[in-house]
Structures are given as C-alpha cells and as structure tokens.
C-alpha cells in the first residue's frame, strides 16, 4: 500500500508580512529560502538538510522596522505547514530527540507531536546579534512554530561560547529530532501513537 504524500503549502498575508511556505516531510533536504535575513536563511537551510525536509520559504516582511514580524511569522506559517503535512499522525513515531555539537557548543532538542503546544527553551546566547538576526527572535520563531504545529518542544543549549555555534547546534538538533519524530513506524501503520486514540 502506498503511503500518502506528506506535502503542504501555506500562505500568510498580513499588513506586516507576506509568507509562503511549502514542505515535503519525505524529501531529501532541498531548500529554497528567501526571508531577507541571511543568517536566518542559513539556519532554515540546516533544518531542511538535517531534517531531510524539502523546504521552500518566501518572506516579504517589514525589515525596515526590524526582523521580529518576519521571523515570528515564518515560524507560524512553517508550523501550520507541518501540521497540515503530518495530517492525522497515524503511523508516526511521534517522539524525537537529538544532541548536536559544533566545536565548543552542544545543544539538545526533544520534540513530541502531542497536539499540545509547549515550548521550554534555555539558550543563553553569548551575543545579541548574529549577522542580521537578533538572537531574541530565535525564541519567537520556535514559539510560533510550536503554537501552530501543535508540538511540545524542549530546547537546551548545554554548552557554548560562540553565539553562531549555539544557534547552529540548536537548529541542527531541532532538525534531527524532527526527522526522528516524523519517521513512519511500520509496526504502527494506520495507528495513532497514543493510548487515547487521538492526538
């Protein structure tokens, strides 16, 4: 029996931003990204490559003010796209976790496609800006994603002296955790991974 494609496209159009996101959860890590914030694109590329998710993101935001609306709204729209692509969650492994190092930095991410949004993030960034990305906005991105994907997400940077390294380990670990959680479990085919019978 052929598994259904897990592909979704979502658009978000507000007075502040215009966003288009397309995801293929069973991709090969191909990314086409244009958010207007170079380092943010770099992090989203890590998400695609290490999560093996094909990802297209186009964002036209009010960057003349700052990056807040753009980064947050990309998180919201990406979360909506993931939720749409995942569907009823039948056969999903559901849980994923990963530790990822980069030189002195080490981060751990744990995700649960629980249907219950919750973000617990502890990342003491060593700098306020990485390129054109305000590090405070990393939290806003993940909060937007969590609320609209319906996941519980724990993010901990365990070590790190360089903000670029800290951020990169967070996004790579997030990608690897997603990849694990989104895998289809052949022993759970057609079954929702919860004793409640729904997520």
From Swiss-Prot:
Enzyme kind, highest EC tier: lyase
Organism from which the protein derives: Methylibium petroleiphilum (strain ATCC BAA-1232 / LMG 22953 / PM1)
Gene Ontology CC terms: cytoplasm
Record-level GO BP terms: L-histidine biosynthetic process
SUPFAM superfamilies: Ribosomal protein S5 domain 2-like
Catalytic activity of the protein: D-erythro-1-(imidazol-4-yl)glycerol 3-phosphate = 3-(imidazol-4-yl)-2-oxopropyl phosphate + H2O
A Pfam family per the record: IGPD
Keywords assigned: Amino-acid biosynthesis, Cytoplasm, Histidine biosynthesis, Lyase
Localisation: Cytoplasm
UniProt name for this protein: Imidazoleglycerol-phosphate dehydratase
InterPro entries xref list: IGPD_sf, ImidazoleglycerolP_deHydtase, ImidazoleglycerP_deHydtase_CS, Ribosomal_Su5_D2-typ_SF
GO molecular function: imidazoleglycerol-phosphate dehydratase activity
Homology family: Belongs to the imidazoleglycerol-phosphate dehydratase family.
Pathway participation: Amino-acid biosynthesis; L-histidine biosynthesis; L-histidine from 5-phospho-alpha-D-ribose 1-diphosphate: step 6/9
EC numbers on record: 4.2.1.19
Originating gene: hisB
């Amino acid at each position: 029996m052929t598994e259904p494609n897990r592909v979704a496209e979502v658009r978000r159009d507000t007075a502040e931003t215009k966003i288009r996101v397309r995801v293929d959860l069973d991709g090969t890590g191909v990314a086409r990204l244009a958010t207007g914030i170079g380092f943010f694109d770099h992090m989203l590329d890590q998400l695609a490559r290490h999560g093996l998710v094909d990802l297209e993101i186009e964002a036209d935001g009010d960057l003349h003010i700052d990056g807040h609306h753009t980064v947050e709204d990309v998180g919201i729209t990406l979360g909506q796209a993931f939720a749409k692509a995942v569907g009823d969650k039948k056969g999903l492994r559901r849980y994923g976790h990963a530790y990822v190092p980069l030189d002195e930095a080490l981060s751990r991410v744990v995700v649960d496609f629980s249907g219950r949004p919750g973000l617990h993030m502890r990342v003491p960034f060593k700098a306020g800006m990485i390129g054109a990305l305000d590090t405070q906005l990393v939290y806003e991105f993940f909060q937007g994603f969590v609320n609209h994907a319906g996941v519980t997400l724990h993010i901990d940077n365990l070590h790190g002296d360089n903000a670029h390294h800290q951020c990169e380990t967070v996004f790579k670990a997030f990608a690897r955790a997603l990849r694990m959680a989104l895998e289809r479990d052949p022993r759970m085919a057609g079954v929702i991974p919860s004793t409640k019978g729904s997520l």
